[in-house]
Amino acid sequence: MSPLECGLYVVATPIGNLGDMTLRGIEVLMLADRIACEDTRVTRKLLSRYTIKTKVTSYHDHNANTVRPVLIQEIKNGGTVALVCDAGMPSISDPGYKLIRDSIVAGLYVTVVPGASAGLSGLVLSGLPTDRFLFLGYLSSKSQQRRNTLEEISGISASLIFHENPERLVRSLKDMSFILGDRQAAVLRELTKLHEEVCRGSLNELWAHYAHSAKPKGEIVVVVGPAKDVEKISDKEISTI
């Protein structure tokens, strides 16, 4: 294996099945001077699977402002840092983008080692149109903010991809059904894992299904089909939901 050029390596990791790690990703993690990750416990399971001994540093929302300058300085000093998240592509719904941004501003070498993505995997498996799509991450836990976001995107003619928390799934599906209309959608849970589950149907059907089922567990992706002739509802109607 050839030595790495000093810089920041943004490395995708498996979203569930550890066997999905790419060969290049394994090589970069082995050769890097340091791995910056969200949860060291999660990342060490992956490293153990592939006998990787590289130093690990925790980098997450609560310490990012302190750790980020240290990582950038290490690269400036000639080091190589691999950035990973708990699952999937770093900087998607995590603080990774700020490290990438600041590294670029500092004139450092930045490259990506692609791989698994829960959002894209969910879109493909949903069976919904893939030619145009919009990824929105997690909707707000606050009801009104969540509805406002859904209102803003209600007329977009593209498949919509969300990450969702099991605690909020039913409420989010209810809001989607009322505001986006009864579009076709899919709820994808525990992708690539032993208990992978895909439920497809209209938003109304999915809302009813999960409202009368035990609370789901694990990581969830919701994909909603494109808008067609979406009937708008008034603010008064929304407030009664």
Predicted features by range, described:
Residues 5, 80, 159-241:
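A contiguous loop/helix-start segment that scaffolds small-molecule binding in enzyme catalytic cores
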Residues 29-35, 107-111, 158-160:
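Short active-site oxyanion
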Residues 41-43, 88-89, 118, 168, ...:
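Alpha-helix capping/helix-boundary segments
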